[in-house]
Amino acid sequence: MRLRAAMIGVAAAALSLSACTTMDGAGATASAGNVPQLQTAYGAVTGTREGASNDVNVFRGIRYAATTEGRRFQLAADPEPWTSARPATEFGSECPQRPSGDVPVFKSWENSVGTSEDCLFLNVWTRGLSDGKKRPIMVWLHGGGYVTGSGSSNGYDGSRLAERGDVVVVTLNHRLNGLGYSYLAGLSDDPKYADSGNLGSLDIVKALEWVRDHADEIGGDAGNVTIFGESGGAAKVSTLMGMEQAKGLFQRAIAQSGSMSLAGFTPRLATPLAKDLMATAGVSSVEELAAMPIDDFVAAMMKSRSKAAFYRPVVDGRSLTRQPYAPDANPVSADIPLLVGTNNNEMRLQGGLGSPENFALTWEQLPAKLTPFVDDADVGEIIAGMRKAHPDYDASDVFFQVATFRNYRNTALRQAERKSKQAAPVYMYRLDWKTPVEGGRLETPHALDIAFVFDNVARSLSYTGPETAQTKRMADLMADAWIAFARTGNPNTAALPQWPAYNVQQRATMIFDVDPEVVNDPDSAERELLQRLLPEGRSL
């Protein structure tokens, strides 16, 4: 048990909380009514038992850091200890954020949780408490870019994954948007704001430290932690792989549909956004920005040039000295195995549901639609090359695939290429199974993989459609591969064809579908064309 020595007195006091409470291990207790209890470094919490066999201990809303109210733009502090057991049965508040809008296919995942600057909470699903078993720990980082989201989505419920693989699942909240990624170091000499550009990532580091320090108590192995995430969560995974502060806190990494851009977001780019936020808020100092009411702060973010959307980690020379896969980056994660991939039609979600006219484009309309995604590349050359590579594609197909490559696949490929030169292996996948929702027009869109990785099809029906033999098959294939990777650093299972590590010679890629297959360099003509003509991709 690696608890802070300063908290020994708190832990001792908690042992005498109730005469009807009995010890069930060094740091966990089980009280009357079979209610699981967990002793943390700061005090005890009580949870629930869930899962198909009622054998998963669940703790929601465990505080891993103190409230940031009154300490905006500053590093997270340890929580104040408590003496009486606190219930951990409800999710903690989310970070204040702009409304995410109504996305019908995400309806099943909605979970109404309030927002507050007191938002540094995590959630745990585990089959054992202080039982001496060294279970792999899987720490999920939520999507939403760096601006929205939380660890409380119904799609992230860890019960089935914990039960299926006997792993520990952890999800968490951290600071987002201007609260977690406003680079203010150039606008104030006060050292307490020196890390303001990367606070969200440093919050995650603090949560990982909590996991390390409580691994025994939650039935896990501090030496076998996998960080995994989708979309913005995958970008956070990539960021952590370049942070010295995170070294040793995880041993494997999975990046789903959101590898970090390989181009740096520097103080030169970040400082003008912070200045614009201050001007929009009507304040002249960082201190005033830190003190203004949170509702006014969020309103100012939404009106500013960033629109509360353009925030990301900053290469500040402190917590992030280089982008993780830049040629001159410090290879702090060279020994970390990586699983990385995308969905085949990512942009049919963002580029389709929000703009339904894109499902019926003409060839005449296509050049103007593609221009925002290709920067200075020759649109005509891209269209001609795509039509040659995919003779059966219509104009909408070309639009969605180029946009998908630009925003997702290219960065995943570049990350895998550079990772393959390091000591630890990298494995590449692509999800091809098509959802029937929206009349099938979404095909294999962004975030569809979440339902299968968590084995949560029943919680994802608005996105996957009804439970069928196919959806069960997809959950079996993907959840078991992710569990295998978390356990051993290798995603191969008996149900999959042999899955080699990725290299630039073969480019072996697992195609996840009802009949999975390994394909070397899938859609090679498309890849060669677009990697030659497009920049390396966008950061989420």
Regions found by a protein language model. Give the residues of each.
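Substrate-access "cap/lid" subdomains that shape
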Residues: 108, 206, 213, 247, ...
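Alpha/beta-hydrolase active-site loop
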Residues: 119, 193-216, 272
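Non-catalytic accessory segments of hydrolases
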Residues: 21-198, 363, 376, 460-478, ...
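Catalytic nucleophile serine of serine hydrolases
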Residues: 229-232, 244, 257
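Active-site loop->helix "elbow" adjoining a glycine-rich segment at hydrolase catalytic centers
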Residues: 143, 199-203, 231-234
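Alpha/beta-hydrolase fold nucleophile elbow
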Residues: 218-230
